[in-house]
From Swiss-Prot:
Can form heteromultimeric channels with Kir5.1/KCNJ16. Interacts with PATJ. Residues 1-60, 166-375 are cytoplasmic. Changing residue 71 to T: In a breast cancer sample; somatic mutation. InterPro entries: Ig_E-set, IRK_C, K_chnl_inward-rec_Kir, K_chnl_inward-rec_Kir1.3, K_chnl_inward-rec_Kir_cyto, Kir_TM. It catalyses: K(+)(in) = K(+)(out). GO terms for biological process: potassium ion import across plasma membrane; potassium ion transport; regulation of monoatomic ion transmembrane transport. Channel activity is regulated by variations of cytosolic pH; reversibly inhibited by acidic pH values. Inhibited by Ba(2+) and Cs(+) in a voltage-dependent manner. It comes from Homo sapiens. This is ATP-sensitive inward rectifier potassium channel 15.
Amino acid sequence: MDAIHIGMSSTPLVKHTAGAGLKANRPRVMSKSGHSNVRIDKVDGIYLLYLQDLWTTVIDMKWRYKLTLFAATFVMTWFLFGVIYYAIAFIHGDLEPGEPISNHTPCIMKVDSLTGAFLFSLESQTTIGYGVRSITEECPHAIFLLVAQLVITTLIEIFITGTFLAKIARPKKRAETIKFSHCAVITKQNGKLCLVIQVANMRKSLLIQCQLSGKLLQTHVTKEGERILLNQATVKFHVDSSSESPFLILPMTFYHVLDETSPLRDLTPQNLKEKEFELVVLLNATVESTSAVCQSRTSYIPEEIYWGFEFVPVVSLSKNGKYVADFSQFEQIRKSPDCTFYCADSEKQQLEEKYRQEDQRERELRTLLLQQSNV
């Protein structure tokens, strides 16, 4: 049976589904790579909130902004304290033109310009200590300023080092080595109609305590007539009989049973591509080497779900007795040999569609009556 490769722009390859190309540009809450598409807007004092949580703000910065900020911070502290040293020397009379008075002791030796004060600040803060410029006992204010500079800049260096280590140690990059299939399929698993996705760990280091869950996001109208734009419903996934903590050493297929309790129970081959929903899938796991908790995310919209297909097997046994995961087959699907579940009786489908339309009309009428009663 021929396999079909599903890539980032290969949705039109599936020709058996009517309307496969419709609504392809619908908005997504989450991108395929797991990044949020929600824009936070019109929040009073949002910059103040970011400053109050400065640690998280700096860690979340991109590297180019972080490096620019830290470089600018060091240069500004050198210059600021250099200006203060220059002011102290000016007030003390160390910058008078002409020959220095024989009995005059300057606050800082060899500092007779703003450039010299800047270099003294830089040498003191970085503990270079060339030995040419040095502070004397003549000015207690200069001594106090030197102590304050070293204490303040030490705290800045501790903060910078901590944020660098925290950003490097974050398990974000580890989560990027967890691969989700680009599409999902609806097929039969153990005689039950299931929605199936495929997940793989791209590294040899194991992920322990894996938990995969899903959230169905769709518009919902309550009995009171309130319209919830992104109602969340839990979608439970299983893998074999170890649904609590699967052993993700090889690419695995996770399935969700489309039974009476499923929020996707109304899906049919005819209405799948016309539905308005987004299925967000989250995999939480603990990294074996660091014990850090990481999360990998993706989402599926109706155009990325294929009815009557199944994934091509990825794992095989080599001649020397080793298990091999062929990732060239990871994004390939093929038609399911059992076509009974998508070749259902047309009268039954028409009856189900009639009931759904009647329920929708009744809900709209209830909403209209409620709105009129509130006038």
